[in-house]
Amino acid sequence: MSPTTGPQPNPRAWECHHTTGPQPNPRAWECHRMKGPQPNPRAWECHLRRVHNLTPEPGNVTIRGVHILTPEPGNVTIRGVHNLTPEPGNVTERGVHNLTPEPGNVTERGVHNLIPEPGNVTVKRGPQPNPRAWECHRTRGPQPNPRAWECHRTRGPQPNPRAWECHR
């Protein structure tokens, strides 16, 4: 874990900082302080002064508010920073996660949609209407399924064994 700011050593990591505007890498997912979708249709927006790392390689390090994206399971989190797996575009804010490889997701109050089907919309809490969506709440500790990183605001794992756990 790194307490410093600045780019990560992995050259394929896409970083967003507290500045506005897109990142120079055209494959990067832009991070803005403004609300609303990003102009890049493949870009998953991030909001509310969060810094995100988005890379397909494992081994990224985190700083405060930075999210790790890696194809390996079993990552751990710090301070509400969530690690998800092979699907791209995971950025989180305050808890609710969906995961999707499709472009065009939109956010609501900093909560990102990340699920296998396009077009979902998130709510502040509770399960998503899509049965394949993976809910994110706020309890502690990893879930028993090694492939599933689940986040809860209530107790217990999600029923979907492929859900990604998320812990503080």
Swiss-Prot record:
Q: Which domain of life is it from?
A: Eukaryota
Q: Where is the composition biased (Pro residues)?
A: 1-10
Map out region (Disordered) in residue numbers.
1-23, 117-143
Identify this protein by name.
Putative uncharacterized protein FLJ45999
The source organism is Homo sapiens
